[in-house]
């Protein structure tokens, strides 16, 4: 059915004007959602001003590598984390942020002619980056990672559409397909076992065959053989990055379940809404988009900054897009996202990742289950590509997440020595597993290259240098000059680290003068650390909130553009209260007790 939103008197709501359409194409190998090519551009207009950038020298690259090595938490041990690194944010924010990143951007970290970690020096010219470095995901919060996107575009044939159709339930056509976890158990709660991602092993043979044809056309024979061998346990979801670790996989599952519960609710309640796919999809998107601002952004960002951006209708974001369009008239695709956001500021979430989690009663407190905690390594292994799913190619029941431990619904500190039910602080220290990433670099014969690919901090710092991002001070100055922030640039970042003399002395002693020309990603983390690490500082908050709010306002059908609030929704909790928190989202979806 067509969803019609009626106003109830008064002036018509201001509607954002949609930008140019992005260019759709065949999905990347192994994904289901169609690719939608769009632009990246600089929020700080590219200038021939050396002081705005890191020095263009090989020595700078070496010092970035040294800085990356210093960003790993040295207090943590193989079995415990430093409790002083705990923030006040529940751990769901880490993986909620990852899900949102996958909604907006794709293929920004691949080695290529435009962006390279290995050959990061010299940096790529700004004009080349803006004309050739492309986003491969629709820059909209439209849940294409859940629903597959719009299957219309060049090269989108019957096989692409057939695989997208596999996302839907095979007989209950208004619902999304979900998977069922299998023994061994026990379940972590008294809910059902239908809490695995859908996998290719459970779909019709015609869907599997279409997926294999698409993969074979795009892969080497060796890669295709591996893809074919592992297809049964591979998740059939729009963006396969949402099955790279178990927490984001279970977060993705909550959307499938929310959609299905919306269908059930509309069928069993006299709301006036038709209980069909379109209604459930529209309501799922609206609730999700409202929570982005009121739940996620106001958790990780300074709420004052978020309100300022919303009230200003993200004017600085739309000015950025207009300036980019003017610079790139002949090469633009439209719907640009800021490079400073996607390759620096939004990577703040890496610092929130824990090495250990109080995951559920089987892998967490009270410690009488299977293991006293879940390691990050295990959370990567119990996925479609992790190699630990059982012979049934499905998630074991004992690995279903207990969301009460991740959403703040059942908090617990770390006084007993086990992991707190909190994310790590947003600061300049990363958990030790991020020094040696589990699934990266294994195909590199050269040990130095393998070490580079596995070290997340070095990767982020090199990528920012290679893409010629402005320094933190340059971005901060620009935001201040245009009235987007009220604070002044941090002239000497090393002064923030009096309690970390080694880091302080390193920054001040670098030939690249990192203390006053600070890599943007590090600057955003340092700014947050100086404020306590429980949320981003003003610069980080401004860039993240401006991008998210701008993306929502650029979509005339988004919750923010329409002025949607959960109390307007026909969907309610059992006590008739609105679904207005991430905990209520999980409970409505029946993935949290």
Model-derived features: where do they sit?
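Juxtadomain coupling helices with adjacent low-complexity linkers
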Residues: 256-259
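Terminal regions of secretory-pathway proteins
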Residues: 1-241, 246, 264-593
